[in-house]
C-alpha cells in the first residue's frame, strides 16, 4: 500500500494513559485517541510507514513496558498493523474535538468550522505527524504559562520556540500579542506542519519565522537575543540545551520549559542553577511539570 500508516493499539492500566500518550507523541505518532474497556484503557495512535519500520514499533513497545516498570504498574499490551491513509485520516480525526486551554485559548481542529463569535483566542491546528494538538498536559501548561507571561505589554516581546513541533506554542504566543517568534525543529515534517498551521492562523511569515534545525540554527536567526524561550521537548534534551540558553538571553529573558516528568524535575533544576537561571515557578499537572525560569542577575 502507498501512503500506509501503522495503527498502534495499546491496552493499558488507566494510570499509564499520560505517560503512554507522551511517549507516542515524542515517538512521532499522530491522532492519539482513547476508549475505556472494562477497567483498562485502549489507546490508539498512528505513525507513517515511510518513517518507521516494524522494528521501530517493537522498540516503542519495549519503551512503553519500561515506563510501566518505572511507575510500578502492569505492563501494557501493544499491537500494530498497517492501514491505508484514508482509513488513518478518518480513524483519528473523528475523536479530536475543540479543546479549551487556560482562560483564553480554544484549540480548533482545522477540519472543523470555528464559531463566528467567541471571547476566546481561536488557535486552529492540523498537526499532521507533528507533536502538539493541545490535549497533552505539557502543551497545556506551556500555553497557560505563555498566557500569564504575555498578559501585560506583549507587543514588544520576541519569542524563541525550540523543538516547535506543530508550532502550537509559537502560534499561541503570536495570538497573545507577541511581536515576533522564531520556531525551530529538527524534524522536516514538523516544520512543514508548523508552516501550514501558521498559514491556517493567518500569521505573516515575518512575524513567525519557522526553520528546520535546533538551537544552533536559531542563533543564526537571532542576532540580539530574545525575551522569552519556550521549549517543550524531552527532559534529557533540555538538559543538554540549558548551557546554551544564555546565548539567546537578554538581561530580563524568561523561559518556559516542559516535557518534563516530575521525577526529572530535580535534574532540570540543578542544571538551571549551575547555568545561572532561577526557577520562578514550577507548575504541575498529573505526573508532568512546567518550569518558569528567568535569568539570574549578574554579580
From Swiss-Prot:
<feature type="binding site">
    <location>
        <position position="185"/>
    </location>
    <ligand>
        <name>S-adenosyl-L-methionine</name>
    </ligand>
</feature>
<dbReference type="GO" id="GO:0005737">
    <property type="term" value="C:cytoplasm"/>
</dbReference>
<dbReference type="InterPro" id="IPR004498">
    <property type="entry name" value="Ribosomal_PrmA_MeTrfase"/>
</dbReference>
<dbReference type="GO" id="GO:0016279">
    <property type="term" value="F:protein-lysine N-methyltransferase activity"/>
</dbReference>
<feature type="binding site">
    <location>
        <position position="232"/>
    </location>
    <ligand>
        <name>S-adenosyl-L-methionine</name>
    </ligand>
</feature>
<protein>
    <recommendedName>
        <fullName>Ribosomal protein L11 methyltransferase</fullName>
        <ecNumber>2.1.1.-</ecNumber>
    </recommendedName>
</protein>
<feature type="binding site">
    <location>
        <position position="139"/>
    </location>
    <ligand>
        <name>S-adenosyl-L-methionine</name>
    </ligand>
</feature>
<keyword id="KW-0949">S-adenosyl-L-methionine</keyword>
<comment type="similarity">
    <text>Belongs to the methyltransferase superfamily. PrmA family.</text>
</comment>
<comment type="function">
    <text>Methylates ribosomal protein L11.</text>
</comment>
<keyword id="KW-0808">Transferase</keyword>
<feature type="binding site">
    <location>
        <position position="163"/>
    </location>
    <ligand>
        <name>S-adenosyl-L-methionine</name>
    </ligand>
</feature>
<dbReference type="GO" id="GO:0032259">
    <property type="term" value="P:methylation"/>
</dbReference>
<dbReference type="InterPro" id="IPR029063">
    <property type="entry name" value="SAM-dependent_MTases_sf"/>
</dbReference>
<keyword id="KW-0489">Methyltransferase</keyword>
<dbReference type="Pfam" id="PF06325">
    <property type="entry name" value="PrmA"/>
</dbReference>
<keyword id="KW-0963">Cytoplasm</keyword>
<dbReference type="InterPro" id="IPR050078">
    <property type="entry name" value="Ribosomal_L11_MeTrfase_PrmA"/>
</dbReference>
